[in-house]
Amino acid sequence: MQGIACSVQRTVWPCQEPGAILSHLECPPEAIVKFALTAPLIFALCFTFLAAAPEEKSPKPQYDTKGNLLRPADYRDWMFLSAGYGMNYSPSPGSHEMFTNVFVQRWAYQEFLDHGKWPDETAFVIDERDAQSKGSINKTGHFQTDLMGLAVEVKDSRRNPDKWAYYGFDADGQTAEAMPRGNGCYACHDAHAAVEHTFVQFYPTLKPVAKKFGVYNEAREQVSDAK
């Protein structure tokens, strides 16, 4: 939380000369009572402003000296958008079915709610986890288990000529190099994402927001074969 400098103006009562020290010997009782009643209110207002101060726009993407993206820390505390299971954009069956959990920074999420667009330094993290069907009392369906890796999408027009860049992390990887321009992820998002380079068509809480601002590409919601 960004701190706010808060100051209380010094009150000079009628019985005081400038620079004099306030004491019960120099001021009448009513002045002492007035000070005692107003001081707590002033300090309470200061603490209220501090508590209501907006959080700093963080976390933002961080990079090492080589320009590699650092693994986003505490991304599980970000805004959860949606989860998929066994999603595959190709007609061919995937080699492994897994859960994909999508997170975005809370400040970026709020910007989208307010303006219908993703600001620079927005980062999406796709948390990829193994799926299991047998365990504990479960009899049907699947549940999530171990982390398999992270896929990260970053919007940064100052760093990326194409605005959006894509990164892949192993389960325990700490840095990742941006995928080359023209990579498959970029091409797929560019051709099929409903809002900018993001698959808002799969995020039920954001679809109505995008439609309200007129930025939702309805055609991208239609069933089609990804190429």
List the predicted regions and their residue ranges:
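Short, Lys/Arg-enriched N-terminal segments with co-localized hydrophobic residues
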Residues: 16-32
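Bacterial N-terminal signal peptides
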Residues: 36-48
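Bacterial Sec-dependent signal peptides at the C-terminal "C-region" and cleavage site
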Residues: 47-57
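Sequence context surrounding c-type heme c attachment/ligation sites in exported
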Residues: 55-57, 61-64, 71-79, 83-88, ...
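N-terminal post-signal-peptidase region of extra-cytosolic proteins
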Residues: 98-113, 136-138
